[in-house]
């Protein structure tokens, strides 16, 4: 909100041509327009429709719930919560110093209800449902829409990051995940969708 003038409540935030964009779908659209030589939107109309539909599904049905669960488990370990915030908070918020942690704790509490165990249990159910959908949509294919990496793959893989924690992700994974995340993901690690997320990061994260 501080970066986008109240128009967005989420990270990441991209500043382009003096304009701060805080919605991931809008960020992708802006980058697609600016750098069309590496398209994330398929040319084929049906594949494009499918990619955008899946982008919307994972944004709406996975994103809020996996964020809630990640912060729910992190909130049980204040020191680790502070360490994660220090590593991931954007510059303008990080400049608040110790206030950044207070801001993050208040923000996640109000936006996600991170201390609500009922909400966390619903989040676990939603995450598994999203993994089911991912596997159903993939079938035996490498990509979700067509035969190349698209916005659908980018969205699904990036939103599953807090669960899978591949080494190629946006934050260091040198420490084990919170105990609650570790116990939740243990029975999921051999699922095709889980392995697909790890492989997608390995192949496409630079």
Where would I find each of the regions flagged by the language model?
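Residue-level detector of alpha-helix boundaries and kinks
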Residues: 12, 36, 112, 118-119, ...
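Short His-centered aromatic/hydrophobic patch
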Residues: 159-204
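GST-like fold's C-terminal all-alpha helical module
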Residues: 63-176
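GST-like domain detector, emphasizing the conserved glutathione-binding G-site
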Residues: 1-95
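Exposed alpha-helical structural elements
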Residues: 26, 50, 65, 80, ...
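Generic recognition of short, well-ordered alpha-helical interface segments
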Residues: 22, 46, 61, 122-125, ...
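Non-transmembrane alpha-helical segments in soluble domains
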Residues: 28, 32, 52-55, 59, ...
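Charge-dense, low-complexity intrinsically disordered segments
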Residues: 45, 117, 121, 187
